[in-house]
C-alpha cells in the first residue's frame, strides 16, 4: 500500500483493456479480400472440417476468419465483410465472415436464426 506522499509523487496506473479484435481498429465490421479459402481441423475433443478464409482487411491486417453456416460461395479474391467473434475450437480464428453481405451469399434453405446467416424470409406455403 503506497503512502500519500508516494501517491503525490507518482499517481496510480490505469489498467488498460486489451481489444479482443485489434484488426477491426474499433470498428464494428471491416471489408476485406479473401487471399485463401480452406478447411482446417478443430482442437482435441472435437472433429470436423471447419471452413475458414484468410482475409486481408482494409485496416492492413491479414486475419483468419470463420465461414459459418452450411455451404458457401467464397473463393480467392472474394470481397467479404468481417466481424469480431472467435471460434473456441479453432486456435487463431478470432473473426467471423458476415453471411449475406458483399460477395458472400446467405445460407440456402435456412429457416431458423435467418438473420445470422443472411437468409431471406421464405414465401408462405400455398394452402
Curated annotation (Swiss-Prot):
Residue(s) carrying 3-methylthioaspartic acid: 89
Gene3D superfamilies (UniProt xref)? Nucleic acid-binding proteins
Keywords from UniProt, A to Z, are: Methylation, Ribonucleoprotein, Ribosomal protein, RNA-binding, rRNA-binding, tRNA-binding
Q: Which residues form the signal peptide?
A: none
**Superkingdom of source:** Bacteria
Q: Which PROSITE patterns match?
A: RIBOSOMAL_S12 (PS00055)
Q: Does the keyword rRNA-binding apply?
A: yes
| Regions crossing the membrane | none
Q: Does the keyword Ribonucleoprotein apply?
A: yes
Q: What's one GO MF term for it?
A: rRNA binding
Q: Which GO terms describe its biological process?
A: translation
Query: What's this protein's family per the entry?
Result: Belongs to the universal ribosomal protein uS12 family.
Q: What's the name of the protein?
A: Small ribosomal subunit protein uS12
Recorded name of the encoding gene: rpsL
Amino acid at each position: 500500500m503506497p503512502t500519500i506522499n508516494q501517491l503525490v509523487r507518482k499517481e496510480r496506473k490505469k489498467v488498460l483493456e486489451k481489444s479482443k479484435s485489434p484488426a477491426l481498429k474499433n470498428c464494428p465490421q471491416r471489408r476485406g479480400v479473401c487471399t485463401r479459402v480452406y478447411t482446417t481441423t478443430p482442437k482435441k475433443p472435437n472433429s470436423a472440417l471447419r471452413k475458414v478464409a484468410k482475409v486481408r482487411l482494409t485496416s492492413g491486417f491479414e486475419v483468419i476468419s470463420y465461414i459459418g453456416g452450411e455451404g458457401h460461395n467464397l473463393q480467392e479474391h472474394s470481397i467479404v465483410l468481417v466481424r469480431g467473434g472467435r471460434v473456441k475450437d479453432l486456435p487463431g480464428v478470432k473473426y467471423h465472415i458476415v453471411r449475406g453481405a458483399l460477395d458472400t451469399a446467405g445460407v440456402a434453405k435456412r429457416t431458423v436464426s435467418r438473420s445470422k446467416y443472411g437468409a431471406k424470409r421464405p414465401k408462405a406455403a400455398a394452402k
